[in-house]
Amino acid sequence: MLIRIPAGGDCHESEVTPEAIYRSRRRFIQGAALAGAAVGVPLLARAAEQYPGVPASPAPPWFVGKLGDARWRAVVAQGEAITPYADATQYNNFYEFGPNKGDPARYAAELKVEPWTVLVDGEVEKPGRYSLDDLFTEGQLEERIYRLRCVEAWSMVIPWLGFPLADLVQMVRPLSAAKFVRFETAYRPDEMRGTRSSFALIDWPYVEGLRMDEAMHPLSLLAVGMYGRVLPNQNGAPLRLVVPWKYGFKSIKSIVRISFVREQPRTTWQSMAPEEYGFYANVNPQVSHPRWSQARERRLPGSLFSPNVRDTLLFNGYADQVADLYASMDLTKDY
């Protein structure tokens, strides 16, 4: 589905990125009709023109094949500068690799992401173990530039590549009894050193969940790439969820299981500290974390003398698109 964020989130692509990159992208788009005939390295090179300076990385054949008809800039973010690739890939929360922001970039290469399968089960007509090629055979790869707001009060703007979550839901045909979708991260102690730590408080594997209407919302994305490339391991390769109106911990990484369930799943952070992390985790500047305010955020990159602090927007700036999902709820209680 082609989504265009209206006035609250739309802009011309030249407003989101430096002119040199913008012009390079326009040259790419003008030649897109020929891209479908290219395969392998030439096609990756064309995709790389989207973001000059981003290091090349190997990509599986199914991903390369999807680049030919990718829908670039399907969603943009008004007046926002894209976070530099180095910041987006070197400052991460991914506790399976360690508690520090640099641990995922340092250790995530130990995770083997090829081959990769996802178990789909629960209240669904087409359960099974699917490869990523199976899941996205019919889908068109889309680039979506989303704001990412961490519950720790920092934020980024990231150009994701992926497929609408709703497409997968419709493909596997959940039964009417399914009211929620439960997601599970890989648990591989031999490859994820953070899970071997005796100091880790998390009951692995990491679990997240959405209501069915949230999963079906057009903004919900299953990401397989970013910055014109395949997802780096530290950012959740090879498959992660992106729900831009929720705090970042809802956007679960390295997904190996998607279950359609009757009851609201007990999610990881909710289980660990329910008074601090609710199931919904919608970005809300009026509902503070018990230990800090959520009214403002630090947009990365920043520095000691230029911290780049700004006001946080309700639903991370996507209120026009998602507020109706919660019209009957008290957002100060259902957080």
Where are these regions (language model features)?
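Generic detector of low-complexity/intrinsically disordered segments
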Residues: 4, 8, 36, 45-46, ...
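N-terminal export signals
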Residues: 27-50
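N-terminal secretory signal peptides
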Residues: 1-24, 49
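Structured, non-membrane catalytic/scaffold regions adjacent to prosthetic-group chemistry
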Residues: 57-335
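Short, cationic motifs built from Arg/Lys/His that form the positively charged side of catalytic pockets
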Residues: 25-26, 240
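Acidic/proline-rich low-complexity IDRs
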Residues: 1, 42-43, 66
